[in-house]
Amino acid sequence: MTVEYTASDLATYQNEVNEQIAKNKAHLESLTHPGSKVTFPIDQDISATPQNPNLKVFFFDIDNCLYKSSTRIHDLMQQSILRFFQTHLKLSPEDAHVLNNSYYKEYGLAIRGLVMFHKVNALEYNRLVDDSLPLQDILKPDIPLRNMLLRLRQSGKIDKLWLFTNAYKNHAIRCLRLLGIADLFDGLTYCDYSRTDTLVCKPHVKAFEKAMKESGLARYENAYFIDDSGKNIETGIKLGMKTCIHLVENEVNEILGQTPEGAIVISDILELPHVVSDLF
């Protein structure tokens, strides 16, 4: 069902978003706690990254993985996404919900469907949706997480800790800085919303190939991978990653997919030292 939104409605929407983004930026710039500054290069030149056959890489998803799904950030994100669907596609709340779920289930990310079928500007979508989330009201420095990642880095068993997310880089970096772990990773593979001609995301194999090239990984059997999506974990297993860990905090999300055979299941990322004890 088509719903008409007035120019006043859209102006109110834009103003609310702009005000929240300004607050988000001001807060981010004020951070001084350990791990609040990014120390790895972003958008590094792939051609300058040699593929090392002996390199061991641990790939980390971010959302609902480095922080708990019980923070309800996903719910906030869904509200923001649905508002975008309603205002920009002129849909009823019910139709927006159905279409969003359809794209998320089919492509792993709503924006991919929006770009493919509605010619949506992906960067504007990111600004109105992810950039406008008041993450600072929810995410705080996570000392236990930081200490665990430090142990993993210092063990000498893994060469690189690498972020692998379907979010755009803005959202990824905000999460890391707020959690106080932005200085513990070696790089970031994200869904590049500026490249709508080649927009790829997990669970697509091409997204994994991108992460492989950017990290310098030469062989999937030298890769460790943790994600809250069963579909993403399934791709990792099919590609031959050494260890794939499905993080299921409470129960499996049907849209994200069931736990595939061969995956390790944990309910909290702090369980990593118990399930891959040889790395710590």
UniProtKB/Swiss-Prot annotation:
InterPro entries listed in its UniProt record: HAD-like_sf (IPR036412), HAD-SF_hydro_IA (IPR006439), HAD_sf (IPR023214), Pyr-5-nucltdase (IPR010237), SSM1_domain (IPR052791)
Molecular-function GO term, any one: nucleotidase activity
GO biological process: nucleotide catabolic process; pyrimidine nucleobase metabolic process
Signal peptide start-end: none
Role noted for this protein: Could be an enzyme that inactivates 6-azauracil by modifying it.
Family (UniProt): Belongs to the SSM1 family.
Protein name, per record: Suppressor of disruption of TFIIS
Organism: Saccharomyces cerevisiae (strain ATCC 204508 / S288c) (Baker's yeast)
